[in-house]
Design a protein with these regions (language model features):
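Conserved active-site-adjacent core of cysteine acyl-enzyme catalytic domains
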Residues: 126
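Extracellular S/T/G-rich loop segment that most often corresponds to the catalytic His/Ser-adjacent loop
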Residues: 7-88
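Hydrolase catalytic cores
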Residues: 59-120, 129, 137
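Mixed-charge, polar/low-complexity N-terminal
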Residues: 5-7, 27, 36, 103-105, ...
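Short polybasic/polar patches that bind polyanions
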Residues: 123
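Conserved small/polar residues in nucleotide/adenosyl-binding loops
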Residues: 1-3
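Secreted peptidase-domain scaffold signal
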Residues: 133-142
């Protein structure tokens, strides 16, 4: 599964071509300290109406070995880590050895946390904020 950040300089149509592929989990960036959307983040939808980004992930003031970093690369890295943990549970631990990228994308969308008062999906948050625990909880409800 590919994970692609959604950064581009045009604020109205800021998604690059790889983030439109059906197998890609496309993420925007938000500030987890106050749950605000990061203004520099990419946003969508696609030119043909695809709903992207799929999710928004933390990407502001992220602690790294080199200090605090901010940006869509941080959000993409955090999402990649969440997907890796999901693959560990799914494939390595044998809970769903045949999991495919579209199915996994669907689980993450179902587990997304949504803010009351906002309509989803939307151009900034997609289907909501990445939440791995809620993704696993969504699996229990399937």
């Amino acid at each position: 599964m590919c994970i692609r950040d959604s950064l581009n300089p045009d604020p109205d149509m800021t998604l690059t071509e790889p983030s439109m592929a059906p197998e890609v989990l496309s993420v925007s960036t938000y500030n987890a300290e106050n749950n605000s959307f990061y203004a520099e983040s990419g946003r969508g939808f696609g030119r043909t109406g695809q709903i992207r980004p799929d999710l928004s992930a933390p990407g502001v003031n992220i602690s790294t070995i080199d200090g605090c970093r901010t940006g869509s690369s941080m959000a993409a890295a955090i999402t990649a880590g969440a997907v890796a943990q999901f693959f560990q549970w799914s494939v390595i631990e044998g809970n769903n050895r045949l999991a495919e990228s579209r199915e996994i994308r669907s689980y993450f969308i179902r587990g997304a946390v949504r803010t009351q008062g906002l309509n989803y999906p939307n151009r900034e948050w997609g289907y909501g904020r990445l939440n791995l625990e809620e993704t696993f909880n969504a699996l229990l409800r399937v």
